[in-house]
Amino acid sequence: MWKASAGHAVSIAQDDAGADDWETDPDFVNDVSEKEQRWGAKTVQGSGHQEHINIHKLRENVFQEHQTLKEKELETGPKASHGYGGKFGVEQDRMDKSAVGHEYQSKLSKHCSQVDSVRGFGGKFGVQMDRVDQSAVGFEYQGKTEKHASQKDYSSGFGGKYGVQADRVDKSAVGFDYQGKTEKHESQRDYSKGFGGKYGIDKDKVDKSAVGFEYQGKTEKHESQKDYVKGFGGKFGVQTDRQDKCALGWDHQEKLQLHESQKDYKTGFGGKFGVQSERQDSAAVGFDYKEKLAKHESQQDYSKGFGGKYGVQKDRMDKNASTFEDVTQVSSAYQKTVPVEAVTSKTSNIRANFENLAKEKEQEDRRKAEAERAQRMAKERQEQEEARRKLEEQARAKTQTPPVSPAPQPTEERLPSSPVYEDAASFKAELSYRGPVSGTEPEPVYSMEAADYREASSQQGLAYATEAVYESAEAPGHYPAEDSTYDEYENDLGITAVALYDYQAAGDDEISFDPDDIITNIEMIDDGWWRGVCKGRYGLFPANYVELRQ
């Protein structure tokens, strides 16, 4: 029971101001009998005892309440009398035309044996004349056949008796009684009727321009016979109603124009004293005109303007005008061309795919460079040893056979040795000018080679052996061949290309370049990405950003 009341705030009104509940009121009357008091048959105010339930009264109350409830439901609820039609559920004006009730009796068609065939196509025995088919005939019908040609009455036909009716005869058809009227000969014609009158002329038919011999032409009068009273106008040669407006007589007096001092300037540009306001020029102003000066910027009301208060009206603001709140980042007009490979695949993914390949390629290039360096150094040492051995053999031969003449070697003969020095100096200058072509080629080779040259020259202590040294150096042809080897090694740039667009490296294994830069030693490792050298860096770059050189 305590669970049912859990969560509800039960408040009991307590009357603290009253007296003790156990005290009896002074005016209390105990009108409860002993039976009622024992069985609780009467309610005592404040005692907690209630009288017993009267079943008959309760049943009557329930019945009354049920009746009132049903009446309210009938009044407020939908009424069956208002609906399809009538008092008991049917309203005739709203009933469906195709809906029928239980009282509807359908008229069934009669059987063939019950049909009254007197009414039908027409008449008493199955035929009604007003409904019979016009093309249907009965047995009493007698067809009228056409008469033979020998039985036809030709007295009524083209016209009249014996085949011709005059009212229907053709106008152009003539009979044998027709008499044609022939035209008279010229000798039989009456020429008293014709052009006019009795003797060949009808006056009403005569040509107006045709005149006879009785015609008398009226000649024009001479100037001396003319009456000049009628002419330009009036009695003596002038008729005023026919006179030219521009023609003036001797009595005309020209009205001279008034002097400026005599003119009335009250009528003019407008109004009294020279100005008429309705004719005044809109751009003409008088001395009483006061020009309204524009206010200073400090006096102008900037609450009205481009829009709203403080200079901006939103409804009048230019759509293309931006305010100070609209901050746009300044960007260059140059737009980078994004290749298809860069859109479909990112550089980070390609870096992950080709990272190991790039490392292996770099290691392979490093191994190749070291192998070439070792091979070149070994070849140089071998050549130096051969040159040193030849020098020693020549020195021994010269010591064993001294020269007969004291001056077999003049100083002039040493002059050809100078081109050798010049060639060596030019060779070193050429090497220093060319410089390293790729990042993988080592530079210490040239310094070691120079040291070898210096070591070889220091070993040549004898003055007479100088020419032999240069001759032996020129004889095997080592240095020119080595020069061509360096040219081929440094000039072998591999596949080269020219940059069409600028590209910024997105990773450590990529290279950056600007338009018209040259990329050398290109390796086409993929269709979309190549690898090469540019600006001293070796790495990946997009293939569609460059153009191969022929």
Swiss-Prot record:
InterPro entries, A to Z: Cortactin_SH3, Hs1_Cortactin, SH3-like_dom_sf, SH3_domain
Superkingdom: Eukaryota
Gene3D superfamilies, per database record: SH3 Domains
Cellular location(s): Cytoplasm, Cytoskeleton; Cell projection, Lamellipodium; Cell projection, Ruffle; Cell projection, Dendrite
Keyword set includes Lipid metabolism: no
Residue ranges constituting the SH3 domain according to the UniProt record: 492-550
Modified positions (Phosphothreonine) in chain numbering: T399, T401, T411
Region (Disordered): 1-27, 344-419
Family matches, as CDD domains: SH3_Cortactin
In-chain residues carrying the UniProt-annotated modification Omega-N-methylarginine: R119
SUPFAM superfamilies: SH3-domain (SSF50044)
Crosslinked residue numbers (Glycyl lysine isopeptide (Lys-Gly) (interchain with G-Cter in SUMO2)): K144, K181, K295
Per UniProt, location of the Glycyl lysine isopeptide (Lys-Gly) (interchain with G-Cter in SUMO1) cross-link in this chain: K144, K181, K218
Cortactin repeats: 80-116, 117-153, 154-190, 191-227, 228-264, 265-301, 302-324
Membrane association type: Peripheral membrane protein
Short name of any one Pfam family annotated for the protein: HS1_rep
GO biological process: actin cytoskeleton organization; cell motility; dendritic spine maintenance; extrinsic apoptotic signaling pathway; focal adhesion assembly; intracellular protein transport; lamellipodium organization; modification of postsynaptic actin cytoskeleton
Coiled-coil stretches: 348-401
Post-translational modification N6-acetyllysine, affected residues: 87, 107, 124, 144, 152, 161, 171, 181, 193, 198, 235, 272, 295, 304, 309, 314, 346
Subunit description: Part of a complex composed of NEDD9, AURKA and CTTN; within the complex NEDD9 acts as a scaffold protein and is required for complex formation. Interacts (via N-terminus) with NEDD9. Identified in a complex containing FGFR4, NCAM1, CDH2, PLCG1, FRS2, SRC, SHC1, GAP43 and CTTN. Forms a complex made of ABL1 and MYLK. Interacts with SHANK2 and SHANK3 (via its SH3 domain). Interacts with FGD1. Interacts with ABL2. Interacts with KCNA2 (via non-phosphorylated C-terminus). Interacts with PLXDC2 and SRCIN1. Interacts with SAMSN1 (via SH3 domain).
Protein name according to UniProt: Src substrate cortactin
Species per Swiss-Prot/TrEMBL record: Homo sapiens
